[in-house]
Amino acid sequence: MQCYSEDENDFSDWEKAGAEGWGWKNVLASYNALENHISKKENYGNGPICVSDLSEQMHPFSKHFMAAARELNWPKPNNTAISSEGLGYVHNTTRNGKRFSSADAFLHPAKKRKNLHIIKNAIVEKLIINNSQSDGIIYEVNNVKKCAYANKEIILSAGAIGSPQLLQLSGIGPEEILKKAGVKLVHHLPEVGQGLQDHLAITKYFMTNERTLNSDIGNFVGKVTAGLRYLLTKSGPLSVPVNQTSGFVRSSVKSIVPDLQIYANPIIYSTNNNGKTYVGKKSGFLLSAQPSRFSSRGSINIQSSDVNIPPLINPNSLHTKYDKLMAIKACQMIQTIAATKAMESVTKKACDPNFSKFDNDALLNNFRELASTVYHPCCTCRMGLSPSDSVINSRLQVHGIKKLRVVDASSFPN
């Protein structure tokens, strides 16, 4: 539900990578047409997607994160500005205390259209390709195989894992990969499923004597109270996201652009014997950091012609020297925030007391051991100029196949 103003440099990078027309000015115009920002101070934008400023509803403990940011001379992000650099209260895609998704904005209002047919619980198995043109799809619903044909275009929006999987299952992709999986080659497009990128974050927990979300919803009475408050008034801890303060910062004064993302949340989690995570009863907070611009590239490739067999995913994380350095800097940033007077004054103890003393080698090993995905996979059908190093052009059309586009995060160049 988090909604950030992107950095204009991100889209400059996209244009340099061959995504013509995806520069900041063009994308900003699209953002303005998509979003409707709601706050007590000001409203702007006329788009269908609601973006709410919930800063006044955030947990009181979060003010300590803001104080730490001021201590480190970080700016306070302005969500109307070009740059979201700094640490601030997160704006969210909510309305009246409820999640407001892209489906709420676009799909639900269109359900009554005569030219829209929604088929639920269906699995698309492959595309129907004839003479280098996508004519339809083969799908299964209720154990019955069916076909659907397109007069104009087919748009894949199955995500950074599903879209390259479907292309490869349809015979579009690297010849050797398809051959091993037993899929007949229709169109050799070597970068389908290649170039996978994702964000990895490391998180550290700290105990505190002050009240946090653990105090509010970490016990039975608190959960019932919060639930009733939400049902009756659409307010309280269940009406705002757990991720309350976040932003983008520079790992050093030499950094040209913000290259780390910080999350600071008034909550900690515990794990039971079955490995299930839950909100602990004792008050605590977490500090999390992730490098924003990893350079390593992985892959997603099918291992069978059966759509029900998951593809092989190789993240190839921390493969480059730069990524290893940034992993260390992410850990160092958590050390820096934790050492501010603002955070030390409310910290009872660190759950990992040795972390503050780790040298660079120990920090890298700690990142390798504990970092986890932030679920931002992308780039597996990336935009570009040439079929030799990309899958689609800047209009999201698949190289060499007519009437076929890919419209999801797999299209990101980086």
Outline where the language-model segments fall.
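FAD-dependent oxidoreductase catalytic-site/capping-region signature
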Residues: 28, 34-82, 89, 209-212, ...
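Conserved, well-structured core segments
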Residues: 1-5, 153-157, 165, 382, ...
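Conserved redox-cofactor binding core of oxidoreductases
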Residues: 15-134, 140, 203-224
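Glycine-rich loop(s) and the adjacent beta-strand/alpha-helix scaffold that form part
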Residues: 30, 127, 135-229, 233-237
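Structural detector for helix-capping/boundary residues
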Residues: 25, 105, 122, 152-153, ...
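Acidic/polar loop patches that form or flank catalytic/metal-binding clefts of enzymes
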Residues: 23-24, 76-79, 120, 175-179, ...
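Periplasmic solute-binding protein
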Residues: 1-15, 171
